[in-house]
């Protein structure tokens, strides 16, 4: 019998509807339901409670941190807990000041405006946002050249919630206009176990504690990845007719190229570049990106923070350098001279398996 609590696999189950409902159900609806980020939750609770007691809109909020830690969920919780409508957009969708003006002019009093990837807005839109955040008005330019005139447009009071993975890319005048900045951190293992157990209950999936711990150890400290891996484990248990035990979890995650440290195919490609192509480094970000065939921004914002966090890579003024732990994990011997070719230190199958036999 499978760990899944439903009938025969051939039964007509509306999987698409169930999956859509699952996506929405996974998001916590209140700060009390939100797992992890204890300090940020306490700060937000104080901010929202004070605003409610004074019958005013909450201050503008900036949520900063790596992808998948709950920035969008927290924005939705801010709207839910303050009982205000929520409008969602993203920085890449605002490439002209006119795009932002259209969004701002449509806001109703007290509305929460969530801008994901706010650091990717056009500079002209950022400059328009300064006045909107401070005085709830914008200036619309009409005409061109010497005959151009500025027409002020009053806006309804609103709260801006911005999310960014690159807070350093925001200009100081914009950062300074946020009343509160929350810095989200990677999750601890025990917090991830709570996230996985909650999601498993919603999936009606019976899963052993050892299996939960295994997923928590491979999900890069990120709830979004934890939930994604859990769904793959669910699929594996369903297809193979097994319980969601430790062996099933390991088999499923190995099938999807997630190693015991949580490294995926892109992580290993980056490490392969540093270790085998550049002798452990140092190597610059752009050079590394070209060798891997990936965008430099993706490596810097998605891959590198995790590799640095688990101690496989260090950043130096000259570039990225592999640590002794990286050489050990991949079964390679560090070269005597920086930049020299790497050699396998153990059985050839170890390094070959980790690197896809591309040594």
UniProtKB/Swiss-Prot annotation:
Region (Head domain (RuvB-H)) location: 260-359
Region of interest (Small ATPAse domain (RuvB-S)), residue spans: 188-257
Record key words, sorted: ATP-binding, Cytoplasm, DNA damage, DNA recombination, DNA repair, DNA-binding, Hydrolase, Nucleotide-binding
One term of GO molecular function: four-way junction DNA binding
Amino-acid positions noted as binding Mg(2+) in the UniProt annotation, renumbered to this chain: 72
Binding positions for ATP per the UniProt entry: 26-27, 68, 71-73, 134-136, 177, 187, 224
Residues the record lists as binding DNA: 315, 320
Residue ranges, annotated region (Large ATPase domain (RuvB-L)): 1-187
Coarse class of the protein's main subcellular location: cytoplasm
Top-level division of the source organism's lineage: Bacteria
Catalysed transformations (reactions): ATP + H2O = ADP + phosphate + H(+)
A Pfam short name: RuvB_N
Listed EC numbers: 3.6.4.-
Localization, UniProt: Cytoplasm
Gene Ontology BP annotations: DNA recombination; DNA repair
Recorded GO CC terms: cytoplasm; Holliday junction resolvase complex
Listed PANTHER family: HOLLIDAY JUNCTION BRANCH MIGRATION COMPLEX SUBUNIT RUVB, PTHR42848
Quaternary structure note: Homohexamer. Forms an RuvA(8)-RuvB(12)-Holliday junction (HJ) complex. HJ DNA is sandwiched between 2 RuvA tetramers; dsDNA enters through RuvA and exits via RuvB. An RuvB hexamer assembles on each DNA strand where it exits the tetramer. Each RuvB hexamer is contacted by two RuvA subunits (via domain III) on 2 adjacent RuvB subunits; this complex drives branch migration. In the full resolvosome a probable DNA-RuvA(4)-RuvB(12)-RuvC(2) complex forms which resolves the HJ.
NCBIfam families: PRK00080.1 (NF000868), ruvB (TIGR00635)
The record's note on its domains: Has 3 domains, the large (RuvB-L) and small ATPase (RuvB-S) domains and the C-terminal head (RuvB-H) domain. The head domain binds DNA, while the ATPase domains jointly bind ATP, ADP or are empty depending on the state of the subunit in the translocation cycle. During a single DNA translocation step the structure of each domain remains the same, but their relative positions change.
Protein task: The RuvA-RuvB-RuvC complex processes Holliday junction (HJ) DNA during genetic recombination and DNA repair, while the RuvA-RuvB complex plays an important role in the rescue of blocked DNA replication forks via replication fork reversal (RFR). RuvA specifically binds to HJ cruciform DNA, conferring on it an open structure. The RuvB hexamer acts as an ATP-dependent pump, pulling dsDNA into and through the RuvAB complex. RuvB forms 2 homohexamers on either side of HJ DNA bound by 1 or 2 RuvA tetramers; 4 subunits per hexamer contact DNA at a time.
Protein name, entry field: Holliday junction branch migration complex subunit RuvB
Name of the gene encoding the protein in the UniProt record: ruvB
């Amino acid at each position: 019998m499978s760990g899944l609590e439903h009938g025969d696999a051939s039964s007509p189950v509306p999987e698409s509807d169930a999956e859509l409902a699952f996506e929405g159900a996974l998001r916590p609806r209140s700060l009390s339901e939100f797992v992890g980020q204890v300090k940020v939750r306490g700060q937000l609770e104080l901010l929202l409670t004070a605003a409610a007691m004074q019958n005013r809109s909450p201050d503008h909020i900036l949520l900063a941190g790596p992808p998948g830690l709950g920035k969008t969920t927290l924005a939705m919780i801010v709207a839910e807990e303050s009982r205000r409508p929520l409008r969602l957009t993203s920085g890449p969708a605002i490439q002209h000041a006119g795009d932002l003006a259209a969004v701002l002019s449509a806001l109703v009093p007290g509305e929460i405006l969530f801008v994901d990837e706010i650091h990717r807005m056009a500079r002209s839109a950022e400059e328009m946002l300064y006045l909107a955040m401070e005085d709830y008005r914008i200036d619309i330019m009409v005409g061109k050249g010497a005959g151009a005139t500025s027409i002020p447009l009053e806006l309804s009071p609103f709260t801006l919630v911005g999310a960014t993975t690159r807070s350093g890319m925001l200009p100081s005048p914009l950062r300074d206009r946020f009343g509160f900045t929350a810095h989200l951190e990677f999750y601890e293992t025990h917090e991830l176990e709570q996230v996985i157990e909650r999601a498993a209950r919603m999936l009606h999936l019976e899963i052993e504690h050892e299996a939960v711990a295994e997923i928590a150890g491979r999900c890069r400290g990120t709830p979004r990845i934890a939930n994604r891996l859990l769904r793959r484990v669910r699929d594996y248990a369903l297809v193979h007719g097994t319980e969601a035990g430790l062996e099933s979890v390991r088999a499923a995650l190995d099938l999807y190229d997630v190693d015991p440290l949580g490294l995926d195919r892109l992580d290993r490609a980056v490490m392969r570049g540093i270790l085998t192509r550049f002798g452990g480094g140092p190597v610059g970000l752009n050079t590394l990106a070209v060798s891997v065939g990936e965008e430099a921004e993706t490596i810097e914002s998605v891959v590198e923070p995790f590799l640095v966090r688990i101690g496989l890579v260090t950043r130096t003024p000259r570039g990225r350098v592999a640590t002794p732990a990286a050489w050990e994990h991949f079964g390679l011997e560090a070269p005597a001279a920086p930049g020299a070719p790497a050699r396998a230190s153990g059985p050839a199958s170890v390094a070959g398996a980790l690197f896809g036999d591309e040594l």
